[in-house]
Amino acid sequence: MNQLEMKKLAAQAALQYVKADTIVGVGSGSTVNCFIEALGTIKDKIQGAVAASKESEELLRKQGIEVFNANDVSSLDIYVDGADEINPQKMMIKGGGAALTREKIVAALAKKFICIVDSSKQVDVLGSTFPLPVEVIPMARSQVGRKLVALGGSPEYREDVVTDNGNVILDVHNFSILNPVEMEKELNNVSGVVTNGIFALRGADVVIVGTPEGAKIID
């Protein structure tokens, strides 16, 4: 079974958490694209969705699913998103697709965060296999980069990428994130940082892992 098939298994399994007549929070990325496709099969059951990226908005509309603005909803029943890494405590690194800020906003609206991944995304320590994305106000890029170096990281400017919010991304290598909650707070306090890709303060409630043996649910 290849990686795409495992992603589809996890995405399909997430449908069991979708309740009738609700608005579903939807993240972004390749695994979420599989979920959007699956969500299209039950589009008449739901009111619609709030999307964390413009790309996800477009895909939802192609499926005939109404897209709501985050400002027009007070809460969401569930938020479904993928991860670049996830640890046993259900904390994640996200932002490979540069949608991390909007993902945090939509996740904060949800009563339940459901993370869908394939088994390659599971790690013991965050930062083991994937650099940490940090969204930065453009004029602060160099200043934030120096601060990240002082904290022990090796930031790399993600060239030719502008976020949906008009900002830039620094990918920080060589961070072994032993205390994700404290690291998330510390980085978010750096002037010029919009947010970083650690999802620890608001981690996942349920993790669905696509494996060669099927979808494994961790709650």
From Swiss-Prot:
Binding site for substrate: 28-31, 81-84, 94-97, 121
SUPFAM superfamilies attached to this UniProt entry: D-ribose-5-phosphate isomerase (RpiA), lid domain, NagB/RpiA/CoA transferase-like
UniProt keyword annotations, A-Z: Isomerase
One of the protein's GO biological processes: pentose-phosphate shunt, non-oxidative branch
Highest taxon of the lineage: Bacteria
Active site: 103 (proton acceptor)
Pathway membership, UniProt: Carbohydrate degradation; pentose phosphate pathway; D-ribose 5-phosphate from D-ribulose 5-phosphate (non-oxidative stage): step 1/1
KW Isomerase (keyword) present: yes
EC number: 5.3.1.6
The keyword ATP-binding belongs to this UniProt entry's keyword annotation: no
GO CC aspect terms: cytosol
GO molecular function: ribose-5-phosphate isomerase activity
InterPro entries reported for this sequence: NagB/RpiA_transferase-like, Ribose5P_isomerase_typA_subgr, Ribose5P_isomerase_type_A
Catalyses which reaction(s): aldehydo-D-ribose 5-phosphate = D-ribulose 5-phosphate
Function description: Catalyzes the reversible conversion of ribose-5-phosphate to ribulose 5-phosphate.
Oligomer status and interactors: Homodimer.
Family of this protein: Belongs to the ribose 5-phosphate isomerase family.
Protein name in UniProt: Ribose-5-phosphate isomerase A
Species of origin: Haemophilus influenzae (strain PittGG)
